[in-house]
Amino acid sequence: MMTRKLLIALAVTLAATSAAHAADAFPRLGTYAIASPHNYYDADYQKQLAKVNVSILNIYPGWGTGQKTTMDATVKKIKAINPNTHVFAYVIGESLQIPATSAWVDFESTVNSSNWWLYGTGLDTSKVLSDFGKAYYILNITTQAKKNSSGKNFAQWFGDYAAAQFGNPNPSLDGIYTDNVFWKPRRDGDWNMDGKIDSQNDPTVQAWYRAGYRQYVDTLRKDMPGKLQLANVADWGQSNAVLTEYKGAFNGGVLEHIIGSSWSVEGQGWAVMMAHYRKAMDALAAPKYAIFEQFGSATDYQGMRYGLASCLMDDAYYAFNNSAHQNYGVDWFDEYDAKLGAAVSKPQTAAWQQGVYRRDFENGIVLVNPKGNGQREVTLEGDFFKIKGTQDPKVNDGSTVRKVTLKDRDGIILLRAKPVKRPAPPAAITTTASN
């Protein structure tokens, strides 16, 4: 009986591991391409987008009308170049600009007539400004928002709206990406419309907020069966973040500016950043299309390697956000062409050697030296090859190495001479043993 149990457990483990690694090979790449111009109909832009695994594109009512195209036609062209890429349409239900731009006038009108703004106190005109400013005012996404004549609150109505306006008319999309899905509100206001101010730090108010987004995404799933739902998960990894309502609700998301900006979580230390990364990943449902987004200069090759190598310690998709043209286009780095294949070791949580972290893949390994660890030399168990690059040839010179020196806050991809393959799961399970 014990032998049977062990064989079954082994088979299940191998099958699950094999399935997990049957998805996109590493390095996995994404882009958060939401900035103007939204010229996704441009053939050159489509070629850029087709090179990555996951793209998030900004769409609005009437997009493509002037070019006599649709988002569906555009996505079809992108997928004709790369059938394995995944494309999501951007929406936001956290706030709305006042006055609304022409594309959003009808949306604003519905919000106004339904009293779906967050108000200072009761149903007056003191709308609450978003912490992003720029005339964006907060919408009441909570379960406590007023219901319309159809018996729906804003969260439910917005789920229907996003599906009807963007999702279902564009079936080639893989799903919807929703921005600013915070784990708690960022402003005080009369969230339950009882004439009193509710604190953003009140756990009850926070639960209303998350439950509202859960209503929203559940509505999206009902309206868009078979599609995936992504969210901005930038603050989900905070140590005090409560994610009860969000657990398994979204299939991926963006860890926006997790590294590279003055306000990035990286500023709290590499270990904190990685714990943040892992906590967000853990809350997502399969296939976990998480985008680890780095902000910075496209010529800071060491910084890019550090971000990419950190990303590769887990299973997210790496996106580089060029400070010269934020959230537009796809910058390409030599490391992106390194075909690492599937991971042959699990996401890494402990240092391998000299404080340096390592993860193994079929066709290579990735090393990352956390900031504050100082310059380190590590010894490899055999011959590995540096990639042959043109952007930083002093590092990526194609040489064979058995020792590697990494600067502080640096990373590197090394290739194997012979690929290492993952074992296939057993074809059958023996169940006859009884001892």
Short names for language-model regions:
Residues A427-A433:
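Intrinsically disordered, low-complexity segments enriched in small/polar and acidic residues
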Residues A22-V420:
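Glycan-processing catalytic domains of CAZymes
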Residues R422-P426:
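Intrinsically disordered, low-complexity proline-rich regions
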